[in-house]
From Swiss-Prot:
Its cofactor is Mg(2+); Mn(2+). The gene is TPS-Lonf. Pfam families: Terpene_synth (PF01397), Terpene_synth_C (PF03936). SUPFAM superfamilies: Terpenoid cyclases/Protein prenyltransferases, Terpenoid synthases. Transmembrane segments: none annotated. This is Longifolene synthase. Keywords: Lyase, Magnesium, Metal-binding. Gene3D superfamilies: Farnesyl Diphosphate Synthase, Terpene synthase, N-terminal domain. Mg(2+) 3 binds at D475. Binds 3 Mg(2+) or Mn(2+) ions per subunit. It catalyses: (2E,6E)-farnesyl diphosphate = longifolene + diphosphate. Its EC number is 4.2.3.58.
Amino acid sequence: MAQISKCSSLSAELNESSIISHHHGNLWADDFIQSLKSSNGAPQYHKRAEKLVEEIKNLVVSEMKDCNDDLIRRLQMVDIFECLGIDRHFQHEIQVALDYVYRYWNELEGIGIGSRDSLIKDFNATALGFRALRLHRYNVSSDVLENFKNENGQFFCSSTVEEKEVRCMLTLFRASEISFPGEKVMDEAKAFTTEYLTKVLTGVDVTDVDQSLLREVKYALEFPWHCSLPRWEARSFIEICGQNDSWLKSIMNKRVLELAKLDFNILQCAHHRELQLLSSWWSQSDIAQQNFYRKRHVEYYLWVVIGTFEPEFSTCRIAFAKIATLMTILDDLYDTHGTLEQLKIFTEGVKRWDLSLVDRLPDYIKITFEFFLNTSNELIAEVAKTQERDMSAYIRKTWERYLEAYLQEAEWIAARHVPTFDEYMKNGISSSGMCILNLYSLLLMGQLLPDDVLEQIHSPSKIHELVELTARLVDDSKDFETKKAGGELASGIECYVKDNPECTLEDASNHLIGLLDLTVKELNWEFVRHDSVALCFKKFAFNVARGLRLIYKYRDGFDVSNQEMKTHIFKILIDPLT
């Protein structure tokens, strides 16, 4: 996402020796990445995992017979499979369980309305059922939650902190995150449960609450749904469940946890191999020797793998990381390391796909253009094989749109022009890079993507527009001070203040946060609504947006990747579970 600094507006020629990098260097030496070795991918571990899957399936069948009409047990099973990251092994069992629950689902009452003693249990079951059914694209209305309010319009809650009530409030909080635009009751539920759960964590009278439940509460508040990606959630919940002695008394739960650990480590081994290929690709390129560019190939691999981790999407992941790495190089070039005239020539070279146009530019820009062409053409050839047709014209047009948006930002900064908020956002959505980044990845997911379906998941589709908007809003709301210090006059916050002189910077920041909250709800709707787009494509786009929320949670994790981002990489990609 471009940050055009003051030196972009200089008319003097820049040369390689005069360039200073303001970013920290590569944290992941190729020797270290190539040294990653683990026996967890050995055949005996795969065999043990396969055996556990069959054992658990048999236990599920037996348990579902024993519990008869116990809906909440079915919902708990679905939830734990998903939280531990092993749900892909039990798709049939999950479908059967949710179909059963949906048959008993009452749009007015949810799952049961009983006496005061059973109300908390029913409230918990209804909230758990609502969340699971909505995420699996069943038609359920949030109006069902209105039944769990008292005469004052507040959700039922006792004055004492009891474990079953904390569990209920946690379940309601998690359900409230899967909201659509205009669902007032969901906003009320989120506000109410956030306040309640925060008080639980900060209170002193929680001796009756299991420590594992408190760990779940802490995780839910720190990593809400839109920044809790599958691999991150799986690692966290494996650790939480492993400390829950009462939960582990069940034979089935022991098997489930063993499988979750095995599965995590087996996948991590596969991800090591992909990371090693990516690191070799980077270290052997000429661009890697240009030390003023950011080197974030490992960080970008983490971005994609935390959401799209399944073995069958290996090609997609590697392509995503390569394109994201290339985009960062271009970002740095347009941001800091090129004059306006050089950038115009570079952009024209991309439009014509012609290396000769940059012959008179400094060597580092020629190396950059070669890296751009080589990477793009390599992946265009991969796309042609996967999609069984030539997509080069479509891809080149998408690159053109992206770099024209960067050039527009460079021209604004050269003229010291602050555009209107609408002008900035329209261009900023394009310069977010999501259009080109997602395009290669979607085309390399291993399934044919006809033009009519591509239009529903890529530009100009609504879900793609929302992913682009998320990227722009996340970047601008978190990076404002950094951009300002770097000399960028045009940011979402500055443009909003210019349009609304009565607003403070804090008001403008809150406006962007409000837009982001609405975008999240619209993304939820686009994700769960039924259409002709295969779910794997929607999941990919959805998780790319969610990944940004995690990576930008504390700061721009790509720009400053030596803090939380480094910890994330060790947790997901380096350190196995024991």
